[in-house]
Protein backbone atom coordinates (compact mmCIF):
# COMPACT_ATOMS: atom_id res chain seq x y z
CA UNK A 1 0.00 0.00 0.00
CA UNK A 2 1.25 3.46 -0.87
CA UNK A 3 0.63 6.60 1.19
CA UNK A 4 0.79 9.90 -0.68
CA UNK A 5 0.86 13.30 0.93
CA UNK A 6 1.39 16.75 -0.48
CA UNK A 7 4.11 18.48 1.48
CA UNK A 8 1.72 20.73 3.36
CA UNK A 9 4.51 22.53 5.18
CA UNK A 10 5.50 24.07 1.85
CA UNK A 11 2.03 25.20 0.84
CA UNK A 12 -0.04 24.56 -2.29
CA UNK A 13 2.08 23.66 -5.30
CA UNK A 14 4.94 22.18 -3.28
CA UNK A 15 6.70 18.90 -4.11
CA UNK A 16 5.03 15.55 -3.41
CA UNK A 17 6.55 12.30 -2.16
CA UNK A 18 5.44 8.72 -2.81
CA UNK A 19 7.31 5.98 -0.90
CA UNK A 20 6.77 2.47 -2.29
CA UNK A 21 7.94 -0.70 -0.51
CA UNK A 22 8.93 -3.61 -2.76
CA UNK A 23 7.44 -5.96 -0.17
CA UNK A 24 6.09 -4.73 3.19
CA UNK A 25 6.78 -8.14 4.77
CA UNK A 26 10.20 -8.82 6.25
CA UNK A 27 12.08 -10.46 9.15
CA UNK A 28 14.42 -9.24 11.89
CA UNK A 29 17.85 -8.90 10.31
CA UNK A 30 16.48 -9.04 6.76
CA UNK A 31 16.38 -6.24 4.17
CA UNK A 32 13.42 -3.98 3.46
CA UNK A 33 13.66 -2.39 0.02
CA UNK A 34 11.73 0.12 -2.03
CA UNK A 35 11.94 3.50 -3.67
CA UNK A 36 11.04 7.09 -2.89
CA UNK A 37 9.38 8.86 -5.81
CA UNK A 38 9.64 12.64 -5.69
CA UNK A 39 7.81 15.05 -8.00
CA UNK A 40 8.72 18.72 -8.09
CA UNK A 41 6.06 21.34 -7.48
CA UNK A 42 5.25 24.47 -9.41
CA UNK A 43 8.56 26.08 -8.44
CA UNK A 44 12.15 24.97 -8.06
CA UNK A 45 13.03 23.85 -4.53
CA UNK A 46 16.23 23.19 -2.58
CA UNK A 47 15.91 19.83 -0.84
CA UNK A 48 18.05 19.59 2.29
CA UNK A 49 17.53 15.86 2.87
CA UNK A 50 15.13 12.95 2.46
CA UNK A 51 15.25 10.50 5.37
CA UNK A 52 13.39 7.27 6.13
CA UNK A 53 12.70 6.16 9.68
CA UNK A 54 11.37 2.94 11.21
CA UNK A 55 8.77 3.89 13.79
CA UNK A 56 6.77 1.92 16.33
CA UNK A 57 4.63 2.52 19.39
CA UNK A 58 6.01 1.85 22.85
CA UNK A 59 4.94 2.17 26.47
CA UNK A 60 6.93 4.50 28.71
CA UNK A 61 7.02 5.25 32.43
CA UNK A 62 8.41 8.63 33.45
CA UNK A 63 8.02 10.11 36.89
CA UNK A 64 5.41 7.55 37.83
CA UNK A 65 3.27 8.28 34.76
CA UNK A 66 2.58 5.67 32.07
CA UNK A 67 1.95 6.76 28.50
CA UNK A 68 2.38 5.68 24.90
CA UNK A 69 5.00 7.27 22.66
CA UNK A 70 6.45 6.84 19.20
CA UNK A 71 9.98 5.47 18.83
CA UNK A 72 11.86 6.44 15.67
CA UNK A 73 14.39 3.64 16.15
CA UNK A 74 16.21 3.47 12.81
CA UNK A 75 16.97 6.24 10.31
CA UNK A 76 18.38 6.13 6.79
CA UNK A 77 19.14 9.25 4.73
CA UNK A 78 18.39 8.42 1.09
CA UNK A 79 19.20 11.87 -0.32
CA UNK A 80 21.34 14.78 0.77
CA UNK A 81 21.11 18.37 -0.50
CA UNK A 82 19.87 18.72 -4.08
CA UNK A 83 18.05 21.12 -6.38
CA UNK A 84 14.57 19.87 -7.35
CA UNK A 85 13.32 21.59 -10.48
CA UNK A 86 9.65 22.39 -11.00
CA UNK A 87 7.88 19.26 -12.23
CA UNK A 88 11.05 17.16 -12.02
CA UNK A 89 10.53 13.46 -11.28
CA UNK A 90 13.03 11.43 -9.27
CA UNK A 91 13.05 7.80 -8.13
CA UNK A 92 15.44 7.04 -5.27
CA UNK A 93 15.97 3.34 -4.40
CA UNK A 94 16.69 2.35 -0.81
CA UNK A 95 17.49 -0.65 1.36
CA UNK A 96 16.90 -0.80 5.11
CA UNK A 97 18.59 -3.65 6.97
CA UNK A 98 16.09 -4.37 9.73
CA UNK A 99 17.70 -4.39 13.19
CA UNK A 100 17.96 -7.91 14.59
CA UNK A 101 15.97 -6.81 17.66
CA UNK A 102 13.06 -5.50 15.58
CA UNK A 103 9.79 -6.56 17.27
CA UNK A 104 7.51 -9.09 15.61
CA UNK A 105 4.25 -7.64 14.27
CA UNK A 106 2.75 -10.54 12.28
CA UNK A 107 2.23 -14.17 13.34
CA UNK A 108 0.45 -16.90 11.35
CA UNK A 109 -0.37 -14.29 8.72
CA UNK A 110 -2.28 -12.14 11.21
CA UNK A 111 -1.35 -8.80 12.73
CA UNK A 112 -0.25 -9.23 16.34
CA UNK A 113 -2.73 -7.30 18.43
CA UNK A 114 -1.11 -4.27 20.05
CA UNK A 115 1.73 -3.93 17.53
CA UNK A 116 2.17 -0.99 15.14
CA UNK A 117 5.19 -0.42 12.89
CA UNK A 118 5.95 1.44 9.68
CA UNK A 119 8.38 3.43 7.56
CA UNK A 120 7.98 7.20 7.80
CA UNK A 121 9.38 9.52 5.14
CA UNK A 122 10.84 12.87 6.20
CA UNK A 123 11.58 15.61 3.66
CA UNK A 124 13.31 18.88 4.56
CA UNK A 125 13.06 21.82 2.14
CA UNK A 126 13.95 25.41 2.94
CA UNK A 127 14.09 24.61 6.69
CA UNK A 128 10.56 23.20 6.61
CA UNK A 129 10.31 19.52 7.58
CA UNK A 130 7.43 17.26 6.54
CA UNK A 131 6.96 13.79 8.06
CA UNK A 132 3.72 12.86 6.36
CA UNK A 133 4.49 9.76 4.32
CA UNK A 134 4.03 6.47 6.19
CA UNK A 135 3.93 2.82 5.07
CA UNK A 136 3.05 -0.14 7.35
CA UNK A 137 5.69 -2.85 7.74
CA UNK A 138 4.90 -6.48 8.64
CA UNK A 139 7.70 -8.19 10.58
CA UNK A 140 7.40 -11.98 10.63
CA UNK A 141 9.15 -14.26 13.16
CA UNK A 142 12.50 -15.83 12.37
CA UNK A 143 12.38 -19.67 12.22
CA UNK A 144 13.63 -20.08 15.80
CA UNK A 145 11.12 -17.51 17.07
CA UNK A 146 8.31 -19.21 15.17
CA UNK A 147 9.21 -22.61 16.64
CA UNK A 148 9.04 -21.24 20.19
CA UNK A 149 5.72 -19.50 19.51
CA UNK A 150 4.43 -22.75 18.01
CA UNK A 151 5.49 -24.61 21.17
CA UNK A 152 3.54 -22.23 23.42
CA UNK A 153 0.48 -22.73 21.22
CA UNK A 154 0.89 -26.52 21.19
CA UNK A 155 1.04 -26.52 24.99
CA UNK A 156 -2.27 -24.65 25.10
CA UNK A 157 -1.12 -21.12 25.95
CA UNK A 158 -3.53 -18.48 24.65
CA UNK A 159 -2.29 -15.18 23.27
CA UNK A 160 -3.32 -12.19 25.40
CA UNK A 161 -1.58 -9.12 23.97
CA UNK A 162 1.75 -7.68 22.86
CA UNK A 163 3.44 -4.37 23.45
CA UNK A 164 6.81 -2.67 23.41
CA UNK A 165 8.35 -1.43 26.65
CA UNK A 166 10.95 1.31 26.85
CA UNK A 167 13.96 0.20 28.88
CA UNK A 168 16.70 -2.41 29.17
CA UNK A 169 16.71 -5.99 30.48
CA UNK A 170 19.39 -6.44 33.10
CA UNK A 171 22.19 -8.72 31.95
CA UNK A 172 21.04 -8.87 28.32
CA UNK A 173 22.91 -7.09 25.52
CA UNK A 174 20.47 -4.82 23.67
CA UNK A 175 21.08 -2.47 20.77
CA UNK A 176 17.60 -0.90 20.83
CA UNK A 177 16.22 1.16 23.74
CA UNK A 178 13.13 -1.05 24.11
CA UNK A 179 11.99 -4.68 24.08
CA UNK A 180 8.83 -6.50 23.07
CA UNK A 181 6.60 -8.43 25.45
CA UNK A 182 4.26 -11.13 24.12
CA UNK A 183 1.80 -12.13 26.82
CA UNK A 184 -0.03 -15.46 27.18
CA UNK A 185 -2.71 -16.94 29.40
CA UNK A 186 -1.67 -20.39 30.70
CA UNK A 187 -3.53 -23.62 29.89
CA UNK A 188 -5.24 -25.61 32.61
CA UNK A 189 -2.24 -27.80 33.41
CA UNK A 190 -0.24 -24.73 34.48
CA UNK A 191 -3.03 -22.41 35.63
CA UNK A 192 -2.80 -23.56 39.25
CA UNK A 193 0.55 -21.83 39.58
CA UNK A 194 0.70 -19.14 36.88
CA UNK A 195 -1.54 -16.20 36.05
CA UNK A 196 0.21 -15.29 32.80
CA UNK A 197 3.54 -15.50 30.97
CA UNK A 198 5.44 -12.70 29.22
CA UNK A 199 7.82 -13.73 26.43
CA UNK A 200 10.63 -11.52 25.10
CA UNK A 201 13.03 -12.23 22.23
CA UNK A 202 16.33 -10.33 22.11
CA UNK A 203 17.86 -11.41 18.82
CA UNK A 204 21.38 -11.21 17.43
CA UNK A 205 22.92 -12.70 14.27
CA UNK A 206 24.27 -15.59 16.35
CA UNK A 207 21.41 -16.47 18.69
CA UNK A 208 18.25 -15.40 20.48
CA UNK A 209 17.98 -14.56 24.17
CA UNK A 210 14.60 -15.86 25.35
CA UNK A 211 13.44 -13.99 28.44
CA UNK A 212 10.39 -15.27 30.32
CA UNK A 213 8.49 -13.63 33.14
CA UNK A 214 5.95 -15.76 35.00
CA UNK A 215 3.30 -14.08 37.11
CA UNK A 216 2.86 -16.75 39.78
CA UNK A 217 -0.30 -17.22 41.81
CA UNK A 218 -0.27 -16.88 45.57
CA UNK A 219 -1.35 -19.62 47.94
CA UNK A 220 -3.45 -19.64 51.08
CA UNK A 221 -0.59 -18.28 53.17
CA UNK A 222 1.67 -16.85 50.46
CA UNK A 223 1.55 -13.90 48.12
CA UNK A 224 1.91 -14.12 44.36
CA UNK A 225 5.22 -13.10 42.84
CA UNK A 226 7.12 -13.04 39.57
CA UNK A 227 9.59 -15.69 38.48
CA UNK A 228 12.11 -15.12 35.70
CA UNK A 229 13.95 -17.29 33.24
CA UNK A 230 16.55 -16.48 30.60
CA UNK A 231 17.79 -18.87 27.93
CA UNK A 232 20.09 -18.56 24.91
CA UNK A 233 18.98 -20.51 21.85
CA UNK A 234 20.79 -20.94 18.53
CA UNK A 235 19.32 -20.19 15.11
CA UNK A 236 20.81 -23.51 13.94
CA UNK A 237 18.63 -25.49 16.37
CA UNK A 238 15.31 -24.27 14.97
CA UNK A 239 14.60 -27.52 13.09
CA UNK A 240 16.56 -30.01 15.20
CA UNK A 241 14.99 -29.52 18.64
CA UNK A 242 11.73 -30.61 20.26
CA UNK A 243 10.67 -27.11 21.24
CA UNK A 244 7.44 -28.25 22.86
CA UNK A 245 9.50 -30.28 25.33
CA UNK A 246 11.95 -27.42 25.84
CA UNK A 247 9.25 -24.81 26.53
CA UNK A 248 7.41 -27.23 28.82
CA UNK A 249 10.68 -27.63 30.75
CA UNK A 250 11.03 -23.86 31.07
CA UNK A 251 7.50 -23.54 32.43
CA UNK A 252 7.85 -26.43 34.87
CA UNK A 253 11.13 -25.00 36.09
CA UNK A 254 9.27 -21.78 36.95
CA UNK A 255 6.60 -23.77 38.78
CA UNK A 256 9.20 -25.71 40.75
CA UNK A 257 9.84 -24.10 44.13
CA UNK A 258 13.36 -25.47 44.14
CA UNK A 259 16.09 -23.32 42.64
CA UNK A 260 17.08 -24.77 39.27
CA UNK A 261 20.05 -24.15 37.05
CA UNK A 262 19.56 -21.88 33.99
CA UNK A 263 18.69 -23.76 30.85
CA UNK A 264 16.84 -26.63 32.60
CA UNK A 265 14.91 -28.67 30.05
CA UNK A 266 16.75 -27.14 27.08
CA UNK A 267 19.38 -28.65 24.79
CA UNK A 268 22.96 -28.63 26.03
CA UNK A 269 24.53 -25.20 26.11
CA UNK A 270 21.28 -23.26 26.43
CA UNK A 271 21.23 -20.64 29.12
CA UNK A 272 24.81 -19.64 28.29
CA UNK A 273 25.66 -16.41 26.42
CA UNK A 274 26.31 -16.88 22.71
CA UNK A 275 27.57 -13.40 21.92
CA UNK A 276 30.86 -13.14 20.10
CA UNK A 277 30.37 -16.35 18.12
CA UNK A 278 30.90 -16.15 14.36
CA UNK A 279 27.90 -14.64 12.58
CA UNK A 280 25.76 -16.51 10.11
CA UNK A 281 22.35 -15.94 8.51
CA UNK A 282 19.49 -17.79 10.22
CA UNK A 283 17.56 -20.49 8.35
CA UNK A 284 15.19 -18.94 5.85
CA UNK A 285 17.06 -15.65 5.66
CA UNK A 286 16.31 -13.86 2.43
CA UNK A 287 13.16 -15.86 1.73
CA UNK A 288 9.84 -14.12 1.30
CA UNK A 289 7.48 -14.55 4.25
CA UNK A 290 4.66 -16.98 3.57
CA UNK A 291 1.26 -16.14 5.01
CA UNK A 292 -0.67 -18.88 6.73
CA UNK A 293 2.25 -21.20 7.66
CA UNK A 294 3.94 -21.88 10.13
CA UNK A 295 18.88 -14.79 36.63
CA UNK A 296 17.45 -11.42 34.86
CA UNK A 297 15.40 -8.37 35.72
CA UNK A 298 13.54 -6.05 33.40
CA UNK A 299 13.89 -2.29 33.22
CA UNK A 300 10.18 -1.91 32.68
CA UNK A 301 8.15 1.03 31.52
CA UNK A 302 5.44 0.01 33.96
CA UNK A 303 5.41 0.24 37.70
CA UNK A 304 4.55 -3.29 38.86
CA UNK A 305 8.20 -4.28 39.25
CA UNK A 306 9.18 -1.49 41.59
CA UNK A 307 11.11 -3.80 43.92
CA UNK A 308 13.69 -4.37 41.19
CA UNK A 309 14.19 -0.75 40.24
CA UNK A 310 17.70 -0.66 41.70
CA UNK A 311 18.83 -3.46 39.40
CA UNK A 312 17.17 -2.20 36.22
CA UNK A 313 18.20 0.40 33.69
CA UNK A 314 14.92 2.08 32.76
CA UNK A 315 13.76 5.58 32.01
CA UNK A 316 15.59 8.12 34.14
CA UNK A 317 13.13 10.84 33.22
CA UNK A 318 11.65 11.92 29.91
CA UNK A 319 12.35 10.31 26.57
CA UNK A 320 15.57 9.89 24.66
CA UNK A 321 16.18 11.91 21.51
CA UNK A 322 14.05 10.77 18.61
CA UNK A 323 11.00 9.89 20.70
CA UNK A 324 7.88 12.00 20.51
CA UNK A 325 4.49 11.78 22.15
CA UNK A 326 1.14 13.51 22.05
CA UNK A 327 0.11 14.90 18.68
CA UNK A 328 2.85 13.13 16.73
CA UNK A 329 1.73 9.78 18.15
CA UNK A 330 -1.89 10.53 17.24
CA UNK A 331 -0.92 11.44 13.68
CA UNK A 332 1.03 8.22 13.17
CA UNK A 333 -1.78 6.16 14.67
CA UNK A 334 -4.27 7.83 12.35
CA UNK A 335 -2.04 7.14 9.36
CA UNK A 336 -1.92 3.42 10.16
CA UNK A 337 -5.66 3.21 10.70
CA UNK A 338 -6.86 5.59 8.03
CA UNK A 339 -5.30 4.11 4.89
CA UNK A 340 -4.34 6.23 1.93
CA UNK A 341 -4.16 9.96 2.19
Where are each of the predicted segments found?
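Short, low-complexity, glycine-enriched hydrophobic/amphipathic alpha-helices that associate
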Residues: 293-341
Amino acid sequence: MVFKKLLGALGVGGPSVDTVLSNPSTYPGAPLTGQVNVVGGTQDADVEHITLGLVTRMEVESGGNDYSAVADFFRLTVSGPMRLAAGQQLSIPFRIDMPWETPITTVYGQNLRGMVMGVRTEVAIARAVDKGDLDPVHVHPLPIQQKILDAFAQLGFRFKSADIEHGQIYGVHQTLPFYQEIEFYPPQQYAHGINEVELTFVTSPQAVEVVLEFDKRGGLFTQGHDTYGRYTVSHHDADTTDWRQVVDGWVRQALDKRKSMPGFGAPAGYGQPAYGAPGYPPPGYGQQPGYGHHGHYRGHGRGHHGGMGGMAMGVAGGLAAGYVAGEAFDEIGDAFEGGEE
